[in-house]
Amino acid sequence: MEYLGKLHQAAVEFPQTDIWMDSCGEEELEYGLKRGIVGATSNPIIVGNVIKNELNIWEKRIKEMVVEMKDASEEDIAWELIYEIGALRSKKLLPVFEANKGKKGRLSLQVNAKYYRNKDKMVEQAVKINSLAPNMQVKIPASAAGVEA
């Protein structure tokens, strides 16, 4: 078998190991999916890098959100964009999710780390993230409040 590089080789030769992509960037997900990844993880920093790399895709939407969300803070707008990107990019993993009956094919998105001491805020945001797509997975800080959440 001819491999598409080391990532693909690892996915084929070690099927017991699930390989995840540490990005929700469109090109990165396409690259990884062709080479056997079964999930992707993200957080606000990763999404920020995705936006920088894909500004041509997201710039118009950001401007629209600023107009639509007149009373929102920059942070609120940023989180709405994070949710949109997460929901959109989770669709790329949906075929893996469906083929594996939900055991693989998830996009993991982290709650806002500033809530690491607020169980209720983390739960509220986790419920929102979970509602974005059937294959969303939520990351919560391993703080005392996070464990309780």
Task: Enumerate the language-model features and the residues they cover.
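Catalytic domains of carbohydrate-active enzymes, especially glycoside hydrolases
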Residues: 31-43
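Structured helix-beta-strand junction loops
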Residues: 14-17, 35-36, 132
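N- or domain-start disorder-to-order transition segments that initiate the globular core
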Residues: 1-27, 31
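Active-site beta->alpha loop and helix N-cap motifs at the rims of alpha/beta catalytic domains
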Residues: 37, 46-49, 54-147
